[in-house]
Amino acid sequence: MLASQAIKRIFHRSWKPLVRFNHGKAPTAIESIKKRIEDIPIENYRNFSIVAHIDHGKSTLSDRLLELTGVIQSGGNKQVLDRLEVERERGITVKAQTCTMFYHDKRYGKDFLIHLVDTPGHVDFRGEVSRSYASCGGALLLVDASQGVQAQTVANFYLAYSMNLKLIPVINKIDLDHADIAQAEDQIENTFELPKEDTIRVSAKTGLNVKEDLLPAIIDRIPPPTGCLDKPFRALLVDSWYDSYVGVVLLVHIVDGTVRKGDKVSSAQTGKKYEIKEIGIMFPDRTPTGILSTGQVGYVVPGMKASKDAKIGDTLMHLGREQETEVLPGFEEPKPMVFVGAFPSDGEEFKALNDDVNRLVLNDRSVSLKRETSNALGQGWRLGFLGSLHASVFRERLENEYGSKLIITQPTVPYMIKYYDGHERLITNPDEFPDLAERRNKVQAIQEPYVEAIMTLPQEYLGNVIKLCDHNRGQQTEITYLNMTGQVMLKYDLPLGQLVEDFFGKLKSVSRGYASLDYEDIGYRDSDVVKLELLINGSSVDALAQVMHSSQVERVGRAWVKKFKEYIKAQLFEVVIQARANSKIIARETIKAKRKDVLQKLHASDISRRKKLLVKQKEGKKHLKSVGNVQINQDAYQAFLRR
């Protein structure tokens, strides 16, 4: 999701905030905004999100709406709500954002206050999505006229539908030569049971029908917020970001009551107390209004120092009125589901890099972090992420922000170990995996996490995709032909461990880029998994160990030893590379000792001296091998882990 150096403010912090204080608006302009908000009753509020697959035009449509309502100038902004560099480069949304708009509807002669809450679409950030939807009365279901319904659209539709949002189907990119509007309408009707006549056709790029049809539909079809101004104040914490000047900034939806600058509030989940230092709306940047009331979506600066204290889904309430304020339902702590080891490529850089990693974790409350030490790679960290995309985004941010070079181990997922005595243990590092003796005597079952994967693809690639899913231990649960044009929706139960092994890249490859994917966690299931280790002269290289299904270990083990052999230079002694699982060696490669001619300077007839030198060389090689100090360059680990 991103490409501009100027927009770097919401997700991390060693940069200058893009979600900045709105210095550009003079005090009179801010007073005018405050007065305009005061004059709009809650029944004229409209809060909505946009549900869309990647590249279906969500950011462009957001820009167009902001232009048409006068929030930004025409043509001067691109992807205003995608504030992270990674968001612009990848075309994804990572953090929830909001922007307030004023719209004068000439049909009614009234002003309306509209809050657009931009949400992440990827499953890794589903926590932000569900909290964003909870702030809204409706959503635009955006579908690309040239691509039709895609997996992410389907997954987010069901989430929005389950939260009782009023859905408005919108077909975008109708100006394209290859747009198939009729097909898109058929898919929307067949997949989501939304009538064709409710569909609005637009071009976000040109603005066609956005002002004429879409804005009036938002006013007419999306219901206003249902909160009560007279009840005790409570707000839903939708998202947060860190600002190097003011600390944590909270994105909130005011469910009931009113909150003002200077008010003292408390958190339902942490019990911590804060004083509101600044409060206002995003227009599109931070615009202080001094007050937020029922139904509004805006920001507060509570003087919070650590992002870890900003818990998505938390309830904020007035200090001293906690007993009479009902906590909002649905709060869940985010659970890391993908773990990697991270080590500096240069061990001497650990201290400096440690500061960088901790700074980024400060800005992303959903990353778990703990120090760990590898016998091969030295000091490093074990990082936990919401999913594989989250891990990828974090790594990219670290490299973009600091130019830091890390050795990142292969991603692993958590495994649940169930013991005969009834207790359970969740492991996140292959080093913690029980050995063969423990598994035989104490372990009742080992479980791995599963997901329900939703894929949409052209029918011609169905065979390839089914073969890929079967190869990755998938179990087909549903197949639906979306329409007569050949689009198919597949549902598979897949092990999460297979998904993080670049399943999406393989899916794109076998479908020539036409397949789309989304998934949802469905819990743990019993599995026959084992730990595969790489040994160098009998010593395990801990950083390279992986947990995988027993059916894969021989194939992967053979590939490992062949690949790692390419990156180890010949030593003065023989180097044996082995793959081991269940205490058995399943593959082996040998690097012959580098021969040194110790006889070069001897006279040809000096036979006894020759024998003595050869015996001495043999003893020396035996000693080196027994010590096992094989010299392995860090580049070898990096190259091997890029497999």
Swiss-Prot record:
Residues 43-226 form the tr-type G domain. It catalyses: GTP + H2O = GDP + phosphate + H(+). One of its GO terms (molecular function) is GTPase activity. It is found in: Mitochondrion inner membrane. GTP binds at residues 52-59, 118-122, 172-175. It comes from the Eukaryota. Coiled coil: none annotated. It is a peripheral membrane protein. GO terms for biological process: positive regulation of translation; translation. Residues 1-18 form a transit peptide. Belongs to the TRAFAC class translation factor GTPase superfamily. Classic translation factor GTPase family. LepA subfamily. Promotes mitochondrial protein synthesis. May act as a fidelity factor of the translation reaction, by catalyzing a one-codon backward translocation of tRNAs on improperly translocated ribosomes. Binds to mitochondrial ribosomes in a GTP-dependent manner. HAMAP family: LepA. This is Translation factor GUF1, mitochondrial. The gene is GUF1.
